[in-house]
């Protein structure tokens, strides 16, 4: 029986694809070597321990119908569209070795006519007239008896959209001498005009087979039929939930302030697991009572725009004469936390 397994997803749903990845990783025999190929429609994928409100422009994402997906590996936030090819290599220990999977991807690129090399811990770069440019980034996850390496290859991604949805870490950029995320990446189509997702998948597959000296039939994973994977429904429900994608953010504090015609407002929130654990409201309004009441209502509230609006508008019952102020406050809060 072959120790290789090849899976290809025809879904563009990031929650579906990450749920498939998680299920395969959890139930695969430790003797198996797996290659999973996939891609996502417009999505910001964040690392397991990242704060989406800090890393992403969540308001712009909502306006543009861009999804947020939290992966189970570490690392930073990335933007995916259909111009990215995603790959995941899995293996049991002690065989799991990310240098092997990296070499498979490099061999695939070489077969396509692209000379690339590994750079740092996570990137693959190509040399251009403007200097080294990143074409691939990766992240990793290990458990006691297995590990995986997953990453993306930029084929013809809309690089102008990176800045729309990601808030770059200025300290990180300064430490690396980088002026912007956009300036240091390039698409493979700049080197191979017309290259397609299917061609890249075929090249990676052939390099995978060549390395292990075996061939297997591909298993096509489709959203039209629930994958025959243990606990898939539960894993997908978790992967697509607000509690996982937003609620798993590390504890953080958020200060919001605004000046209205009726006074200035400062909101101080402490947030843990997506819930407000402490809310303080400061104002120079001539009638601070509704804002003082709001602070109490927000304690324990989900840190989600619709929930904040709901709590604010509930005060209209007790403070009908402040309807204008409360509706202005509600709309501002909802926009500020998206």
Curated annotation (Swiss-Prot):
Q: Give a GO biological-process term.
A: protein modification process
Q: Does the keyword Cytoplasm apply?
A: yes
| Taxonomy, superkingdom | Bacteria
* Keywords for the protein's UniProt record, in alphabetical order: ATP-binding, Cytoplasm, Ligase, Nucleotide-binding
The family database entries (PROSITE patterns) matched by this protein are listed as:
BPL_LPL_CATALYTIC (PS51733)
Tell me where it resides. Cytoplasm
Please state the span of the N-terminal signal peptide per the UniProt entry.
Answer: none
Q: Name one GO molecular function term.
A: lipoyltransferase activity
Q: Which reaction does it catalyse?
A: L-lysyl-[lipoyl-carrier protein] + (R)-lipoate + ATP = N(6)-[(R)-lipoyl]-L-lysyl-[lipoyl-carrier protein] + AMP + diphosphate + H(+)
| EC number per UniProt | 6.3.1.20
Which pathway does the record list? Protein modification; protein lipoylation via exogenous pathway; protein N(6)-(lipoyl)lysine from lipoate: step 1/2; Protein modification; protein lipoylation via exogenous pathway; protein N(6)-(lipoyl)lysine from lipoate: step 2/2
Q: Which HAMAP family match?
A: LplA (MF_01602)
Q: How does it assemble?
A: Monomer.
Task: Please report the name of this protein according to its UniProt entry.
Answer: Lipoate-protein ligase A
Q: Which gene encodes it?
A: lplA
